[in-house]
Amino acid sequence: MSFKDDLEDLETAEDFLRFLGVTYEQRVVNVNRLHILQRFQDYLSADTGMEGLDDEGMAARYSAHLERAYQDFVASNAIAEKTFKVHQEEARKMADRFVPLDALLPT
């Protein structure tokens, strides 16, 4: 079986983390599993250098991207990371609502 074939058998965030050798804390995964997988997919999609890699090279690259995605949520949270569209839209709304202090003071 190839690396890609092995990936097709994975179902959960924990499956991916174990298969790719990423050490994780269950509490982080419990809260952020979808966000971690989405960020992992984002990193994979942005990686233009995987074409032509053998299985070992692909596994190393996938592992690095998953480690990075996981670490994003160890150090932060889903809202701050704005992983999903709903979080991105909320951040834009909040930016539109911002009123600088000097705009409130009489001139």
Swiss-Prot record:
Homotrimer; associates with NifD. InterPro entries: NifW. Pfam families: NifW. It comes from Azospirillum brasilense. May protect the nitrogenase Fe-Mo protein from oxidative damage. This is Nitrogenase-stabilizing/protective protein NifW. One of its GO terms (biological process) is nitrogen fixation. Keywords: Nitrogen fixation. Belongs to the NifW family.
